[in-house]
Amino acid sequence: MPRIPALVPLAPWERTAQLALFMLVMLAAWRGAWLQHAHDPYEFLRHGNDSLGYYQWLPATFIHFDWSRMFWCHQMENGNWISLFTLGVAVLQLPFFLVGHAAAFTFGYDLNGFSAPYGVAMMLGGACYTAAGCVVSFRLARRFSAGLPALIAAALLFVATNVYFYAVREPMMSHNYALFLIGLHAYCSLRVLDGPRGAHVLLLVLSGALIVLVRQLNVFSLLFPLLVAGSKDRVRLFFSNILSKHASLISGLALGMLPWALQMIYWHWTTGEAITFTYGKKGEGFEWDKMVPGLVVLGVRNGWLVYTPLMIAVMTMLIRRAWQGIAPARTVLLLTCITWLLYSAWWSWHLGSGYGHRGFIDLYALLAVPLAWLIQAVMSRGLIWRMTAAITVIALVQLNMGLIERYDWFWSWEDWTWKRLFEQVSDVVIGK
């Protein structure tokens, strides 16, 4: 059975670095989003795409008091309109929406949920959850590696992957929120196995409920604690430790079920069903006979490893550690493969109008562990290895930032080709 390393408390410098990581990522993401959308913050929230689908619950609930007046819905055969998007992201955005509402009231802006104060507050919210996701990635990686490699891994997730795109250009999308939730759930799972405080149990249950409410496909990430436990005795210990904190368990269940109850009330009101697969109402779903796993990771249309090549090395390290039986490599690899195969069967396997197959972002807190292993391995090598790795990382960050700056929505369309992508890469390399 792969052994989970014992919990080692953070050193003082690591606690300081953790706070610095949060502040730097939060400020960089907030400033980047503000610069990206400052020309029209009103349109930033109104733009008709998935972002509006997640956000629309807040103005519909707190301003219009009417769920039938949401703005990005699909009309069903019975004539009713339904939001394809659940309210999980809106629950996480709520504190920042209230800040924006208070600012709009104080400074005389329109109290409509879409004026500039709401937009700036939502940018701040996205930045905070991205930063929190980097912090939980650090804490997870730190459990299985030294502090410095874990810190570098968390920072690289922000600057060298498509996390940056969804922090700056599309901060209202669900993926960075899901990254934080899955990372928090995995971290709390390990703490519950250690012998938890009440807060760990409460956050474990609450984050699990929100993970599924934000993106239902991520339900498989809830297998993490059962898989990483590694034996029946450890699984029994996991549940025993949860039940030992019954007050926290009840509180977590109550908080987690409240938004689910609201969601089911809405579904029943508009469809007559308490549990609804909303995309099915639009004729969208999984096509198991048309799976394209190769295109999901290597296709020119949003192929994960094409647009986030750092993950080639990360997956190589993950597979190696899984072969060696080092925890939690097999668990992380299994969850990554499940996600990969599910997206390969989705009717829109490339998740159009995205950058670098955004579906994998949700798992990046888990993938911070093999990334930290990779960094630790390089740091143990000689000077030439370390210099080569540093130059490679700088090049990957430059490539990531350059492609994000040049990105346009048609990159995921059918007429997007390798030739056109290489032209963009060439422009990044020569600084055009």
Predicted features along the sequence, with ranges:
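Membrane-lumen/periplasm interface segments of specific transmembrane helices
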Residues: F224, V228-R234, H246-R320, V332-Y343, ...
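Aromatic- and kink-enriched transmembrane "portal" helix at the membrane-lumen/periplasm boundary
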Residues: L111-C134, L151-L184, C188, A209-N218
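Membrane-interface helix-loop-helix junctions at transmembrane boundaries of multi-pass membrane enzymes
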Residues: L7-A11, P196-G198, D233-L253, T316-L334, ...
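Membrane-interface alpha helices of multi-pass inner-membrane proteins
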Residues: L58, A154-A155, H200-R215, L222-L227, ...
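Hydrophobic, aromatic-rich transmembrane alpha-helices
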Residues: R3-P9, C134-S137, L305-L333, L367-A377, ...
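Specific aromatic-rich, kink-prone transmembrane helix
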Residues: V136, L156, Y177-G208, P225, ...
